Every structure is written in structure tokens, then in C-alpha cells.
């Protein structure tokens, strides 16, 4: 076949045109470039004149003149040539047959020499292959007549009929000169004929060379039965020669001929046939078997490299035997279950990494039933893997107990004791170690939790309620009850409402007397058994030295696991497939040996492998695949961690998904399979969802499967905004990463501060340096660490490693700044308030997480902090101005900094400064930029954070919000890049210690000179402290002076946490969080000094958010200390008021309480609980507000129209009243807190598209707000159907601007109840300054990380908020906004079109099937695209409101409308400007 490759990738086929009319045909067809396909190749036909090209093509077309009699002769001549070619081929075949008979005769004679025989066979085999190729090439070179073209170009007699008689079987095409589409007929016939000839040639080639893949492709493309039979005839001769040449040892082309024979048998309707295609090195399953051999009864494809069985195999209805042994199958299709006649399925020695191995081991019938149950959705599988949690203090024998439970049942106690003596009585565990304990019926996944207290904060991420807990303690410890008490409460807190299954296991019973054992048992029964669901067998005493009680404990564990619901007997088979697929990705990769008999042998192998791998600075891991079922399948492999090829998908702080890989080999089912696996430590949730769908899980089943595998310990997934995007496949790896920092075995993290330069000592050799920034970001997600911003060199805070109590420099700072309470009271210059949270229990790690969140609050000056406390100042307006001046005037460069790095550092600081300060603006050059940093060390005041709490220049801040967000993103990227550079520099520094020491000495001298010059210039009014890590900071001396040394206003805050000290303590509230605020040199009558109250409210919101999101199962009581008790006797404990009693008094219209210690002295509620009285807004008097007609009913009470009167002028307002009604006491308190919370949120808002709060009233509580003359959006759309597009877009834009303002607050404000009834209209004129405003902030929350809680009105709610009490972010408002857009667009409520669904069905479809309203077809693409983006099921894909406002603004202008009216300040838009000052009425605050 003559083809050539042309430039655009097509194959060119030359077709000669001969005969009298060739010029006409070539001229017409030369511009035809239509491509066509033969198999997977694309061809184009080139019609050419042989005389012009001087070449001879493989194909030709004979043109004939229908009116010329000579055309008959041309036809006869062409036919004669064809007949001669056929005769030559027949002669060649006869000669071949004669040669075959001769060879058979020679073959039957005895051979004189074996070596000669081998040489003879080899020679003939080569000769045979050469002959086959030569014959094929000769056939391709012989020109083929495709067809005749007969044209009528003249006048006269037509010989067309005679030509057709002579042509015989050769096609004839009549060309009509008056038919302009004749060229299409020519091309169609040409391409068909060329395709037929080429396929015939390829078919012969496939059979002569044994290429089954090519044969399969040809059969699938379609070929005639005649061609198949013709090829089979040719192939029979080749097979015979193959038999002779190879001495019956092998058949060269038997596979292709077998397939060809099966196809012919199928065409003859022969049933029960078999097809053997083994040992042919096939990479693909021949699909032609399915389409052309559907009558097969037996199929053998063993010993190939097939990776997949096609789903279409179910069409082989008669198949009884399928042999796929020794292939590369990774999975089995569900469609195998539809082969009802299949009796034998052989898939041994395949990897099958994505299919449960134990199912296959149980045979064909079990496998087919398993697949069928998945198809039918039956839940009939059993999960016999139980999570076993070993918890307790260090040194009590947890690891030894775990090892004892893993021991062989036949080992004697003496041998067991000898083994323990070699390893020690106790084995120290850092973090969490995961092992497997094999039982007869149950496999236990043993999680051994490190008992050192330093690891306790990280344990919460691994504890689940679907587990058996072994609370291990040492019977010889006299204080064991305190250890048991902590862990029972910890487990209870993590179990939510369910009662956990706790086994109390005392070790070292061999060292105790019977009396001691009896006493311990009595203590446990009286105090701790009540916390466990296990009552009869909850207590066990064992000895890991002599094995006492071990066998009995294992039996108890097995029995209780069987009785409990931990062994799941009705789970979908798809769960097992999902587990296997995740195992292939990296899950279960850290399981330790389960077969005790192989421990010694495997250890020896590991040692040998480790010696071999010592040349690499990589991590050696021993992994075992733990399997269910009765057959133990153990694969112990030593793997070399190679992180040089890792793929970091995204290292940003918003979306961090890194793939950590290591090579591995799997020999579980295949001895010859050595495919390297990629073990990923964690994957993106979207990737996890894809695995779920490949495991045959429906979308609505994914959440249940995720929770199941999480509770079973296979994966870790936390449905919180920060962690939702991650699925941890290897919990052991995560525990190792955490314990690598939070550990007792190194000294690089000093007092909770980690210099990133020390990561070389911690992570070098374990994790590739390129992923260190990603690991730090991952630890931030789990609130284990926090990377300090604007640090050079970079550092991170590890809160759990801070000193437990103030020591050394921390203690010195605290004593100087936080003076004793009696001294402060005696000065008569301080006002004190605060609160106390009491908990029945609080797991370790609570305050470190709270500390991280407090550090993110703006408007504070951190003085120092430790593991259970933080001391800070609330910045005043004057403080902010002084800080700005100090940062501009004085700057000390970090150690080893050059002028270039200085500029970079300043620029970075500038970005952060502008984003965190409401009053800081960027300068034109980096050298004059104000540097604002966060406190980087607990040892001194070096940093300041400025917040909008100061209310300075709010308008400027609003305008700069978008720029600040961009700066923040850039700053994050810069920090990541700096981390990588710093890490690289650290390695270089380690290699050049001598040079660095010299450089450091020089730099230290330079620093000393700078210090001396600075102190001389500033008259020693400042000091310079050297925080470790080469960080020099300027600190004013008066920063560490007593607050009484100055008469300026000062606000101090001390937050401390107290743990339970003794189990025997009689105090029920032994876990306390105390907040104390001291305001010096301020007056209660000074309405400008409300900063302390505002910060107090934000701090309480931060605490409440953490408690509700992560510790919702704990009982919390909030108490308020009596300030009169404190003032009267600061040495004694004050009376404590319950917060509910304060609220109850306020609801009764009373502003005072009575002290429990002194009933004669009233206590003002606004003094002791300023968060319950919003000082930022005026308290209006009764004669200043006139209440008129009722205009609505709110969630808390009634809404009236009224007037705000002052100096004979009035302003129409809306009055929202809190009405108690017949609610329960708890509902009354809750609703009041929400009502009050709405006032708190609104008091800090100042935007034209947010309804303004003018003031509040008491008895009953009321809010006085702006009045919307045109009502709410819901009723407006309900009444008015025809709305101009211009006004629709204006409404959309106004609402978007209001929400954008909310989300740009710091922290962002989440409305949580955005819907059309909460949007109010102030003008129906699209050219008015304001048309729409957002209102009703009763459910709003400020979100540092996330908010949580159940919500209603599911039609408007984001999927992540419906029907589940989980955390979410401000992106839920973006989703609700899409529903508002839809409502404005259509005039209808969301989902009104769906009338056949009940509420629960609605919720399920919204959450699980992405059900959304139908956008009208005439909706402009800009608006429809915006709606679809905003209602994305993935919160991360929903756009920021800056983008939404931009899109709507551009769309507004593109409508050729008038420009959007400039929105003026509230002062200008008010009908009575003299009533308003800074957005607040000029009113006298009521006393």
C-alpha cells in the first residue's frame, strides 16, 4: 500500500486514474481533501495521472467513454489482468502446499543431531517469517483496480450495458456530467474500495504475524465474512509450517487463527466453543470476542498483561469458564454478575489493588454474589475490623499490652516474659502508632496513643466513638484514679451523646497484693464504670510480664465487639471496594505486622534492606496489608521514601492539597507483579469523591461511606471549613508529622517557638525540603501550629509547647504589667469586669487553640502568653498613633539582612499592615511604610495589631478592603516563597558552619553598633531585646512599667485557663476559663471609652464559636464576678452571678442585681456585663420615640412604624420589639441573646446598603432602625410582576454591595439568613442613591475560622447548612445571594416549581443531587453564569463579592443605562441632616 505522511498528520493514498477521460476526472477531483478513517488512522486520497507523476500506485481507477466502442476492449483487458493475477496467486499457493508436504516428509525422519535439529528449526523459522513478509509486500505492490467510471461525453450509441456485462464483479460508476455532486459518489466509492483492500491486507498481516491486537481492531471495525474465510485459508498453511518449524513446541500464529476460527464458528451459530489466547503478551482484552464470539462457553486469556475486563463482557451469555490468571487486572467489573452461566472465574496472580482480596479468595460464587449485591443495592457485607484505642498515661504498659495481645496463643508465658525483658517492660510511644491484631473472627486495628501529656492536644483528631477503648493504667501507681478520670472524661467528650465502650485495664497486677487489687476494683466500679457502655466486663487486671489475664482480655474484647454494633453486618459491598481503592492510593499503608510468627524473620529481612538503603537519606517503613477473613495475607516490604518526585498541587493557605509519594511493591496476590505504587498521604476531597463513584457509590451514599471509614480508622476526614477539603489516607503519617514537632525528644522548639531554620534538624531525612511549607500549612489547618507573619527568619508558634505557667521572662513581664488586684483596687483608678466559663471537663489542647484565635483578633497589643494564659492591651486611639510614629522612625533590620532584603521585608510588612489596620495607608516607598506585626514571642512586646474596633477612618477602610484582600494573598505567596528560600539557605548554612560563625560574629558587632547608636540618639528611653533566633526588637521601657505609672487610659486583658488539679477535688467546676479586663484612668460616664466593651464582646464571640464548633458536647456555665465584692475585699473570692440571671433581670426591665454577699448594695448589670449593653449606640428614652401602627412580625416579636423625636423635629423609624410570649425559660434566654447579638452586630456596621441602627430602648428591649418606605423585597415582588431590567440589576447591585461590606469586615460577618423578606426597599427609582438595603442580623455571626448551628428556610440555605449541625463560612451568604438573584430575575421563590417533593426529599436533593431552580432561557448569560457560580455545591468555588459587584456593575453599564448614582454619606442622604452625626442620632444617652 503506497501511503505517505503529509504535514497535518494525515496519511496520503495515491490513486492512479487511467483511461481516455482521466484528465477530466483528475481535474475535478484534485481539490477534494475530505479525510476518512481506516481503523485509527486518517487518510486523504490524491487522484493523480501516472504519466505525470512517473510513479505506480497501489490502486487505480479505469475511466471509460460510454459512447466509444473501444471502451469494451479496455474493460476486457483490465478484467484479463485481474484473472492473471489470481492465477499467479493460486500457483504460488500450490507450490507452498507441495513444499509443506516435502517438509512433513523431512520432519518425520529421525534427526542425527539434536544441536543440528535446533539450528535447522531456527533457520526454517526465520525463513518462514521472511517468506510471509515478502508475500504480503508483494500483494501490496500489485496495483488493484478499484472500479470503472463510465462517462457519457459525446453523442451516439451507448455501450454502458455491454461494459457492465464484461466488468463482472468490478463496480461500475456512471458519471453524469450534468450532476454537480458526482464527485461525492466517486469519493465515496473510492474510499470504500480502498478501505476494503487495506483491511484485507491488514487482516492477512495480523494473521501471518500473530498480532491479535491488530486483528481485534480490524474485527471491531467491521469486515466481511468472505474476507475472514479467505484469511483463514491462508492462515491454515502458515500454521502447518509453524508446527513443522517449531517441532510442535509452539505455534507462531495460533492465537490470531484461534480468534479467527472462533469468529467463524460464531457465524455458523456453533455454541459451546472455547477460545484459548494465553501467553500472547496481550495488553488489552480483545473486544471482538464480545461482539463476534458471543457463543463462547470457555475463554482463556491467562498469562497476558491485560489490565481491565470490559463491562461489555456481560454479553457473553453462554460463558461458563473465564480464566484471567496471571494478568495485570486491578479491578473486576460489576457486569460479571450478569454472566448467569459462569461457573468458574480464575483471577489468581493479579494485583487487584482495587477489589477486596478476601472476596476473591472465597471463590467464584461468592465473588459473583458480591458483585450482584452491589448492582441491586443490597447491604449484605460484614465489616469485621474493629478500632481498638489504647489510651493512658506514659509508662503504664500500653505498648507492651498491645504487643501481648498480638502474641501467638501457643507461646509459653516464660518465652513471652523473656521477649519482654529484651525489649523492656514498657515501650515509649510518640504520637500515635497503629498496629493490627489478628483474631479468629475479628481483626483489631490497635491505635496506641502516646501517653506523654505533650501529645494530648493532638489525640482529639484520632478519637472516635465507633471504637473499643482500652484505658490502661498502672495498678502500682497510687494516683491512678486521676489518670483514669482524665481519660474517661476525654473519651466521653469525644463520643458526643453516645456512651463509649471503655475497658479499664490495670497492668502490673503481678506486683500487687489481693487487697490492693480489690481496693482498685472498688474505686473503678464506684467512679468510672458508669462512663462505659460495658458494665459486666469493664475491668481487667493483667500482667505483660507473665501473661496473666491477656488471654481472658482478648476473649472479652472479641465477645464485646461481637455484641456491640462495631461489627457491621449490613454494609454495602461498595464500602469494601472503596476501602480497597483507597488502600491502593495509600490508606492502610502503615499497618504493622499481624502475624506474630513472622516477626523475627521479617525483622531480619528489614535489617538487610535497611543496610542496603542506608546510602539514601530517606525514611524506611515497614508496612503490612491487614485483611479480613480467615486467611492471613501478610506482605512485609521495606520501602524507600523518595520525595524528589512529589507533586505539590497547591500550597496556598486557602487550598492546600499536597501529594506525598513513595514507591512500593505489592506481592499479596501476584508473585510476578512488581508494579510501583504511589502511596499518597492525603488527597483532595474531590479526588476522594471520584474514588467513591468508581467504587459504585451514588452521590447520596458518599457522606455515609466517608463517616464509616473515618470512624473505622481507615481514613480521617473532618467536615469543617478548614479541613473539609482534605481526606487523610494515612492517619499514622499524620500522627507522625504532628509528633515530629510536638515531641519530648528534641530541644529545637524552645518555649513554643519554632525557628524554621531548625526544621533541618527535625525533618531532614524524613520529608523532602520542598514540602516543608506544605507540612506547616497542614499543621495550621489542624491548629497545631501557627506561622507568625512578617517574621524574618520565619518562625512558627506551637502553642501546646509553651510553658504551662509563666516562667523566667514571661513571669517577669506579667508581674510588671499585671499588678496585684489589691494594689489596683487601692489606686481608685481602675474599673474591672470579666467573666468565668466553667466546664465539667475540658480536654487538653483547648486553650492552645483558643490562643491561636485570640492572636488573630485585631486592635490588640500582645504582651506575653504561655500555655494557659495570655496578657494583652486593648489599643486606644492614641496608642495607634504612637505605634505608627514609632514604626516609622525606628527600624532594626533582622540579623543577616542586607539592604535588598530590608526593602523586601518592608514591602511585605506593608501589605500586611494595610490589611490589618483600619487607619494605616501605604506610602509611596517601602522605606516609609508603617510596619505592623503580630506578637512573635511570649517574651516581650514587639508587635501591634490594629483593628476597626478603633473606628478610625472607616470610610477609607471600606474603600481599601478589596486592595487589602489582594495584598493578603500576595503576602501569603511571598511567605511561602521565603520559606523555601530560607530552607535552602539553612542547608547551605549547615554545610558551612565555620564561615557562618565568622559572619555571625561580624553581624553581631554590627548589631551592637546599631544598638549603641540608637540608644545614644534616644537618650536610653528605649531598650533592645534579643529574642532567640537572631531577632532584635525595639521595646519602649515604659511598655513594661506598671499601668499606674501613667495617667493615660489603658485597657488590660488577662485570659487564663485552669485545669483540674486533683481527682478528689470537691469543686465540681474544676475546669475554668477566666477573662478579666482592667480599664485604668477611664470613667463610666465617658461614652468614648467603649473599646474594652467592644473587645470583650468580640472575645466572647471567639470563645463561643470555638466551644460550639469543637466542644459542643460539653456542659458550659458562664458566671460573672460581682465588682462590688472585688472593690470591697479584693483578697476574697467575689460572688458570682449566672449570665441567665442577668438576662432575666433585663427582660423584667431591671438594670440592677443584688449581690449574694451584700444585699444592701445594688450591682449595675451594664457594669459587670457590658456585653449585654451596647455602649456604642444610644439608649433612647420613652419620650424620644413614638410607636405607631404595627407593620410586621419578626422572629423575636413585633415591628412597628414610629417616629424619633428631638428638638421639635422627627424622623420616621422602624421599632423592633422583643416579646417574651409563652416561651420556655431556656428559649427566652436564647432569643434574648440573639436579639442582643443583632444589636451588637448592627452597632458596628456603617454602610449605605445596610439598614442603620439608631439606638436601643429598654423594658421591653427594642431596636430603633431606619424605616423602609417600600417594604421588603418578598412582598414587593409578590405584588409587582413587570419590573424593568434596569431596576432589577440595580437591586442586585445594591444587595451585593451590602453583603460585600459584611464580608470585608475583620473578621467577616456571616449573615446566615439572607432571603428576600430580609431585603428592604428604600426607593423604586433606579437613579436614587440607595434602592435596597440588607437587614435582620439576628442569626449573624463573626467568623474567624467558621460558624456553626442549625438553620431554617432551606429554600434559601446553602447545602452545607441544611439539616446538619456543622461548620461553614461566609460563602453560605454567597449561595443565598444566588437565590435572591433568582427571585429578582423571575419574581418567584426558589424551588416553587418543584411541587411533588416533600421537605425531606427537597433537602436530600439539594444536598446530595445538586438540585437547583431552573434559570429562565431568556436570562442574560452574565446573570445566569453568576447565579450558577454563586450556588455551586462546593463553597470554595463560590466567588468573592468583589467579583460579583464588578460583574454586576459592568453588566449595568453594558445595558447602556445611566451611570450608577454616587452613593453619598448618611449625613447627606438623610432628610434631616441635623439629626444625624456620624450615622448616629444626636441624642443624649440615658443614664
From Swiss-Prot:
Q: What GO cellular component term, any one, is given?
A: cytoplasm
The cross-references to PROSITE patterns, in alphabetical order and at most eight, read:
LRR, PROTEIN_KINASE_ATP, PROTEIN_KINASE_DOM, ROC
> Which GO MF terms are attached to this record?
ATP binding; GTP binding; protein kinase activity; protein serine kinase activity; protein serine/threonine kinase activity; protein tyrosine kinase activity
Q: Where is the composition biased (Polar residues)?
A: 932-950
For bias type Basic residues, the affected ranges are 116-125
Keywords attached to this Swiss-Prot or TrEMBL record, sorted alphabetically, are: ATP-binding, GTP-binding, Kinase, Leucine-rich repeat, Nucleotide-binding, Repeat, Serine/threonine-protein kinase, Transferase
Catalysed reactions, as listed in the record? L-seryl-[protein] + ATP = O-phospho-L-seryl-[protein] + ADP + H(+); L-threonyl-[protein] + ATP = O-phospho-L-threonyl-[protein] + ADP + H(+)
User: Where do the LRR repeats start and stop?
Assistant: 295-316, 318-340, 341-362
Q: Where is the composition biased (Low complexity)?
A: 897-931, 951-1007
Give the region (Disordered) as residue ranges: 108-134, 891-1007, 1464-1487
Give start and end of each Roc domain: 379-564
Show the Pfam families listed in the entry.
Answer: COR-A, PK_Tyr_Ser-Thr, Roc
Disulfide connectivity for this sequence is: none
Q: Which domain of life is it from?
A: Eukaryota
Q: Name one GO biological process term.
A: sorocarp stalk morphogenesis
* Keyword hit for Transit peptide: no
Residue positions binding GTP = 392-399, 448-452, 507-510
Q: What class of enzyme is it?
A: transferase
Catalytic residues, per the record, are 1313
List every stretch annotated Small GTPase-like: 379-564
Binding of ATP occurs at: 1191-1199, 1216
Coiled-coil annotation: which residues? none
Q: Which positions fall inside the Protein kinase domain?
A: 1185-1452
PANTHER family reported in the protein's UniProt record: MITOGEN-ACTIVATED PROTEIN KINASE KINASE KINASE 20 (PTHR44329:SF288), SERINE/THREONINE-PROTEIN KINASE TNNI3K-RELATED (PTHR44329)
- What family does this chain come from, according to its entry? Belongs to the protein kinase superfamily. TKL Ser/Thr protein kinase family. ROCO subfamily.
Protein's recorded name: Probable serine/threonine-protein kinase roco11
* Organism listed in the record: Dictyostelium discoideum
Query: What phylogenetic lineage does the species belong to?
Result: Eukaryota, Amoebozoa, Evosea, Eumycetozoa, Dictyostelia
Q: Tell me the gene name.
A: roco11
Amino acid at each position: 500500500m503506497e501511503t505517505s505522511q503529509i504535514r497535518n498528520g494525515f496519511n496520503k493514498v495515491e490513486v492512479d486514474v487511467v483511461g481516455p477521460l482521466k484528465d477530466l476526472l483528475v481535474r475535478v477531483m484534485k481539490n477534494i481533501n475530505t479525510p476518512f478513517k481506516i481503523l485509527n488512522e486518517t487518510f486523504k486520497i490524491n487522484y493523480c495521472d501516472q504519466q505525470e507523476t512517473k510513479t505506480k500506485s497501489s490502486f487505480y481507477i479505469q475511466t471509460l467513454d460510454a459512447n466509444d466502442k473501444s471502451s469494451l476492449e479496455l474493460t476486457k483487458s483490465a478484467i484479463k489482468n485481474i484473472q492473471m493475477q489470481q492465477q499467479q496467486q493460486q500457483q504460488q499457493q500450490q507450490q507452498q502446499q507441495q513444499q509443506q508436504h516435502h517438509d512433513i516428509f523431512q520432519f518425520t525422519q529421525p534427526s542425527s543431531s539434536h544441536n543440528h535439529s535446533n539450528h535447522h528449526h531456527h533457520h526454517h523459522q526465520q525463513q518462514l517469517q521472511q517468506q510471509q513478509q515478502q508475500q504480503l509486500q508483494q500483494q501490496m505492490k500489485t496495483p488493484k483496480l478499484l472500479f470503472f467510471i463510465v462517462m457519457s461525453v459525446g453523442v451516439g450509441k451507448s455501450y454502458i450495458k455491454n461494459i457492465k456485462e464484461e466488468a463482472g464483479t468490478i463496480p461500475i460508476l456512471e458519471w453524469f456530467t450534468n450532476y454537480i455532486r458526482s464527485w461525492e459518489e466517486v469519493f465515496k466509492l473510492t474510499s470504500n474500495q480502498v478501505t476494503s483492500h487495506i483491511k484485507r491486507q491488514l487482516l492477512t498481516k495480523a494473521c501471518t504475524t500473530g498480532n491479535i491486537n491488530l486483528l481485534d481492531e480490524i474485527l471491531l471495525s467491521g469486515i466481511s465474512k468472505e474476507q475472514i474465510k479467505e484469511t483463514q485459508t491462508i492462515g491454515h498453511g502458515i500454521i502447518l509450517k509453524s508446527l513443522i518449524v517449531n517441532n510442535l513446541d509452539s505455534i507462531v500464529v495460533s492465537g490470531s487463527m484461534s480468534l479467527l476460527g472462533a469468529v467463524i464458528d460464531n457465524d455458523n451459530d456453533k455454541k459451546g466453543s472455547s477460545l484459548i489466547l494465553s501467553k500472547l503478551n496481550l495488553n488489552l482484552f480483545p473486544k471482538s470476542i464480545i461482539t463476534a464470539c458471543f457463543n463462547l462457553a470457555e475463554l482463556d486469556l491467562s498469562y497476558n498483561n491485560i489490565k481491565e475486563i470490559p463491562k461489555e463482557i456481560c454479553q457473553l451469555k453462554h460463558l461458563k469458564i473465564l480464566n484471567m490468571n496471571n494478568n495485570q487486572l486491578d479491578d473486576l467489573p460489576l457486569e460479571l454478575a450478569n454472566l448467569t452461566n459462569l461457573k468458574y472465574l480464575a483471577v489468581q496472580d493479579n494485583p487487584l489493588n482495587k477489589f477486596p482480596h478476601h472476596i476473591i479468595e472465597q471463590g467464584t460464587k461468592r465473588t459473583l454474589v458480591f458483585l450482584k449485591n452491589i448492582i441491586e443495592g443490597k447491604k449484605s457485607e460484614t465489616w469485621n475490623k474493629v478500632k481498638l484505642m489504647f489510651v493512658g498515661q506514659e509508662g503504664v504498659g500500653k505498648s507492651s499490652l498491645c504487643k501481648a495481645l498480638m502474641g501467638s496463643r501457643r507461646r509459653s508465658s516464660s518465652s513471652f516474659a523473656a521477649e519482654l525483658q529484651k525489649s523492656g517492660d514498657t515501650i515509649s510511644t510518640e504520637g500515635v502508632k497503629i498496629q493490627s491484631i489478628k483474631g479468629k473472627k475479628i481483626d483489631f486495628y490497635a491505635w496506641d496513643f502516646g501517653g506523654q501529656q505533650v501529645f494530648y492536644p493532638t489525640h482529639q483528631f484520632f478519637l472516635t466513638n465507633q471504637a473499643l477503648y482500652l484505658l490502661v493504667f498502672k495498678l502500682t501507681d497510687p494516683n491512678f484514679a486521676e489518670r483514669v478520670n482524665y481519660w474517661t472524661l476525654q473519651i466521653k467528650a469525644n463520643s458526643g451523646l453516645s456512651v463509649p465502650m471503655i475497658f479499664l485495664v490495670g497492668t502490673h497486677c503481678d506486683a500487687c497484693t489481693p487487697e490492693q487489687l480489690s481496693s482498685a476494683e472498688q474505686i473503678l466500679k464506684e467512679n468510672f464504670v458508669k462512663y462505659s457502655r460495658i458494665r459486666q466486663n469493664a475491668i481487667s487486671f493483667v500482667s505483660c510480664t507473665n501473661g496473666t489475664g491477656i488471654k481472658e482480655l482478648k476473649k472479652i474484647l472479641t465477645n464485646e465487639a461481637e455484641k456491640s454494633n462495631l461489627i457491621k453486618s449490613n454494609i454495602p459491598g461498595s464500602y469494601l471496594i472503596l476501602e480497597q481503592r483507597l488502600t491502593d492510593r495509600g490508606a492502610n499503608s502503615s499497618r504493622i505486622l499481624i502475624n506474630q510468627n513472622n516477626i523475627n524473620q521479617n525483622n531480619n529481612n528489614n535489617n538487610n534492606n535497611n543496610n542496603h538503603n542506608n546510602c539514601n537519606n530517606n525514611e524506611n517503613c515497614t508496612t503490612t496489608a491487614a485483611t479480613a477473613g480467615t486467611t492471613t495475607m501478610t506482605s512485609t516490604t521495606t520501602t524507600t521514601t523518595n520525595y524528589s518526585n512529589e507533586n505539590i498541587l497547591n500550597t496556598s493557605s486557602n487550598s492546600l492539597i499536597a501529594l506525598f509519594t513513595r514507591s512500593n511493591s505489592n506481592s499479596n496476590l501476584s508473585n510476578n507483579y512488581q508494579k510501583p505504587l504511589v502511596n499518597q498521604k492525603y488527597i483532595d476531597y474531590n479526588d476522594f469523591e471520584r474514588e467513591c463513584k468508581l467504587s459504585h457509590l451514588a452521590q447520596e451514599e458518599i457522606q455515609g461511606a466517608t463517616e464509616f471509614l473515618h470512624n473505622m480508622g481507615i481514613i480521617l476526614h473532618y467536615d469543617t471549613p478548614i479541613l473539609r477539603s482534605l481526606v487523610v489516607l494515612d492517619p499514622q503519617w499524620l500522627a507522625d508529622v504532628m509528633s515530629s514537632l510536638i515531641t519530648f525528644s528534641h530541644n529545637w522548639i524552645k518555649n513554643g517557638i519554632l525557628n524554621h531554620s531548625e526544621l533541618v534538624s527535625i525533618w531532614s531525612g524524613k520529608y523532602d525540603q520542598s514540602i516543608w511549607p506544605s507540612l506547616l500549612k497542614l499543621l495550621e489547618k489542624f491548629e497545631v501550629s501557627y506561622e507568625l507573619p512578617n517574621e524574618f527568619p520565619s518562625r512558627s508558634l506551637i502553642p501546646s509547647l509553651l510553658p504551662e505557667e509563666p516562667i523566667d521572662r514571661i513571669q517577669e513581664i506579667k508581674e510588671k504589667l499585671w499588678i496585684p488586684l489589691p494594689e489596683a483596687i487601692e489606686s481608685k483608678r481602675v474599673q474591672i469586669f470579666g467573666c468565668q466559663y466553667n466546664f465539667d471537663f475540658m480536654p487538653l489542647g483547648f486553650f492552645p487553640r483558643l490562643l491561636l484565635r485570640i492572636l488573630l483578633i485585631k486592635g490588640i497589643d500582645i504582651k506575653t502568653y504561655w500555655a494557659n494564659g495570655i496578657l494583652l492591651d486593648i489599643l486606644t486611639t492614641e496608642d495607634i498613633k504612637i505605634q505608627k510614629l514609632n514604626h516609622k522612625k525606628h527600624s532594626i533590620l533582622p540579623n543577616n539582612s542586607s539592604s535588598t532584603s530590608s526593602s523586601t521585608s518592608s514591602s511585605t510588612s506593608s501589605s500586611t499592615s494595610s490589611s490589618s489596620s483600619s487607619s494605616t495607608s501605604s506610602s509611596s516607598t517601602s522605606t516609609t511604610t508603617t510596619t505592623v506585626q503580630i506578637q512573635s514571642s511570649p517574651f516581650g512586646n514587639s508587635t501591634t495589631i490594629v483593628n476597626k474596633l478603633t473606628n478610625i477612618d472607616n470610610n477609607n477602610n471600606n474603600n481599601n478592603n478589596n486592595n487589602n484582600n489582594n495584598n493578603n494573598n500576595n503576602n501569603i505567596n511571598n511567605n511561602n516563597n521565603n520559606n523555601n528560600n530560607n530552607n535552602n539557605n539553612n542547608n547551605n548554612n549547615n554545610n558551612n558552619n565555620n564561615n557562618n560563625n565568622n559572619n555571625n560574629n561580624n553581624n553581631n558587632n554590627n548589631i551592637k553598633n546599631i544598638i549603641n547608636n540608637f540608644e545614644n540618639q534616644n537618650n536610653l528611653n528605649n531598650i533592645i531585646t534579643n529574642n532567640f533566633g537572631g531577632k532584635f526588637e525595639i521595646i519602649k521601657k515604659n511598655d513594661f512599667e506598671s499601668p499606674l505609672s501613667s495617667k493615660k487610659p489603658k485597657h488590660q486583658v488577662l485570659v487564663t485557663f485552669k485545669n483540674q488539679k486533683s481527682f478528689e477535688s470537691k469543686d465540681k467546676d474544676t475546669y475554668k476559663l477566666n477573662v478579666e479586663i482592667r480599664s485604668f484612668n477611664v470613667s463610666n460616664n465617658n461614652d468614648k471609652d467603649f473599646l474594652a466593651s467592644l473587645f470583650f464582646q468580640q472575645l466572647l464571640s471567639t470563645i463561643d464559636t470555638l466551644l460550639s464548633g469543637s466542644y459542643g458536647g460539653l456542659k458550659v456555665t458562664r458566671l460573672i464576678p460581682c465588682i462590688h465584692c472585688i472593690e470591697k475585699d479584693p483578697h476574697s473570692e467575689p460572688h458570682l452571678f449566672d449570665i441567665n440571671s442577668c438576662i432575666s433581670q433585663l427582660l423584667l426591665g431591671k438594670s440592677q442585681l443584688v449581690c449574694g454577699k451584700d444585699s444592701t448594695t445594688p450591682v449595675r448589670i451594664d457594669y459587670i456585663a457590658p456585653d449585654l449593653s451596647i455602649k456604642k449606640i444610644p439608649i433612647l428614652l420613652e419620650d424620644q420615640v413614638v410607636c405607631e401602627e404595627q407593620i410586621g412580625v419578626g422572629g423575636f416579636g413585633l415591628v412597628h412604624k414610629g417616629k424619633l423625636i428631638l428638638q421639635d423635629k422627627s424622623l420616621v423609624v422602624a421599632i423592633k420589639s422583643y416579646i417574651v410570649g409563652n416561651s420556655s425559660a431556656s428559649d427566652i434566654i436564647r432569643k434574648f441573646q440573639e436579639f442582643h447579638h443583632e444589636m451588637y452586630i448592627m452597632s458596628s456596621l456603617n454602610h449605605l446598603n445596610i439598614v442603620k441602627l439608631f439606638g436601643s430602648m429598654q423594658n421591653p428591649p427594642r431596636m430603633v432602625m431606619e424605616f423602609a418606605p417600600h417594604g421588603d423585597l418578598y412582598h414587593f415582588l409578590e405584588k409587582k410582576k413587570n419590573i424593568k431590567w434596569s431596576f432589577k440589576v440595580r437591586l442586585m447591585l445594591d444587595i451585593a454591595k451590602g453583603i460585600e461590606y459584611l464580608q470585608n469586615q475583620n473578621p467577616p460577618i456571616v449573615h446566615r439568613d439572607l432571603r428576600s423578606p430580609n431585603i428592604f426597599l428604600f426607593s423604586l427609582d433606579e437613579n436614587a442613591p440607595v434602592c435596597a438595603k440588607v437587614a435582620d442580623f439576628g442569626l449573624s455571626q463573626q467568623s474567624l475560622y467558621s460558624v456553626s448551628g442549625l438553620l431554617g428556610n432551606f429554600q434559601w440555605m446553602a447545602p452545607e447548612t441544611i439539616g446538619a449541625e456543622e461548620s461553614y463560612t461566609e460563602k453560605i451568604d454567597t449561595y443565598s445571594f444566588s437565590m435572591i438573584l433568582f427571585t429578582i430575575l423571575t419574581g418567584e421563590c426558589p424551588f416553587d416549581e418543584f411541587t411533588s417533593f416533600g421537605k425531606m426529599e427537597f433537602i436530600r436533593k439539594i444536598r446530595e443531587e445538586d438540585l437547583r431552580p431552573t434559570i429562565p432561557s431568556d436570562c442574560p448569560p452574565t446573570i445566569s453564569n453568576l447565579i450558577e457560580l454563586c450556588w455551586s455545591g462546593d463553597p470554595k468555588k463560590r466567588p468573592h463579592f468583589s467579583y460579583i459587584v464588578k460583574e454586576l456593575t459592568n453588566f449595568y453599564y453594558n445595558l447602556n443605562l445611566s451611570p450608577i448614582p454616587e452613593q453619598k454619606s448618611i449625613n447627606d442622604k438623610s432628610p434631616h441632616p441635623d439629626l444625624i452625626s456620624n450615622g448616629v442620632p444626636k441624642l443624649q444617652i440615658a443614664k
